[in-house]
């Protein structure tokens, strides 16, 4: 990775009884750094050459304000969730209206699905870092419906909201 780009590799097992594993690669590029009045903005793509199980794309902005750190983004694919809004990119081209869903066994760039689909969704979070303690409180909104995980016996999320304490 570089100061403006990061990459992630994931290898996930869904159900060992049927040997259901999936790998995916994610790339995120920072478009610009946080400034006094502007948030840091990045664009990312998950599952670049995978089977599409994790595929999502996003644009995300982050801004620190005092002891708080705020994040807000728009996502497609898994990050669209149930779809908060119509995909705004359809206004640019009808190509963005239909999301490719046949990825075969993976291993090939699946650019036909990038930033596409009828819907997009919002995600975000906030964190508060205590000055006097190495502790932060976090709140997150994640619209992912975890369809694959639920289909193989995983728990269905009851809420898109999560809270955490980090120390």
Regions flagged by a language model, labelled:
Residues 1-56, 63-68, 77-79, 110-111, ...:
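Transmembrane beta-barrel domains of Gram-negative outer membranes and organellar outer membranes
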Residues 56-144:
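Detector for outer-membrane/organellar transmembrane beta-barrel domains
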């Amino acid at each position: 990775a570089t100061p403006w780009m990061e990459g992630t590799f994931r290898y996930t097992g869904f159900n060992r009884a049927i040997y259901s594993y999936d790998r995916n690669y994610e790339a995120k590029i920072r478009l610009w750094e946080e400034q006094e009045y502007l948030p840091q903005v990045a664009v990312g793509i998950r599952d670049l050459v995978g089977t599409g199980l994790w595929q999502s794309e996003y644009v995300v902005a982050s801004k620190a304000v005092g002891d708080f750190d705020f994040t807000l983004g728009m996502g497609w694919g898994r990050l669209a969730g149930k779809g908060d809004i119509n995909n705004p990119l359809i206004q640019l081209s009808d190509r963005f209206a239909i999301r490719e869903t046949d990825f075969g066994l993976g291993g090939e760039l699946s650019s036909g699905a990038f930033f596409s689909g009828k819907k997009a969704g919002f995600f975000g979070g906030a964190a508060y870092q205590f000055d006097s303690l190495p502790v932060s409180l976090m709140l997150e909104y994640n619209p992912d419906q975890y369809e694959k995980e639920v289909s193989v016996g995983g728990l269905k999320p009851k809420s898109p909201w999560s809270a955490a304490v980090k120390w």
